[in-house]
């Protein structure tokens, strides 16, 4: 998992590739995105603004997509680990691009203005004590060059 301390830092790196630039463009328009609706730019990128106040019991992992979480308001703890260090609880489902795992990972706290990038070789779970607002972008992994 990579944590970027500001939207500006993300945008500085994003110009290197079209899909990362698309993510940066979404950051610029995040306040205009209606929460609770998932938008799509083909199969390569989908996004939504969500309010989150739940704590995940299990780790979630993806294979086809890299997830980018842009924190617009509030703070949230994230526990993450390499999938190889976790135990699979529910098998991977192609139709949802999700697999569920359990175990222990490292915990970090992120806040408004920070961005996390969850690679598809990792799994994560969110620990929430208060409402957060974030832009969540899923970018197809096979077409990406690592951002930072």
Predicted regions mapped to residue ranges:
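A generic structural signal for short beta-strands and their flanking turns/coil linkers
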Residues: 41-45, 64-66, 76, 133
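Short acidic (Asp/Glu) patches
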Residues: 48-62, 93-104, 119-122
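Short glycine/proline-enriched turns and hinge-like loops at secondary-structure junctions
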Residues: 61-62, 128-131
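A short, N-terminal "cap"/entry segment at the start of jelly-roll beta-barrel domains
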Residues: 1-49, 56-61
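Glycine- and acidic-residue-biased ligand/ion/polar-headgroup-sensing regions
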Residues: 64-66, 70-99
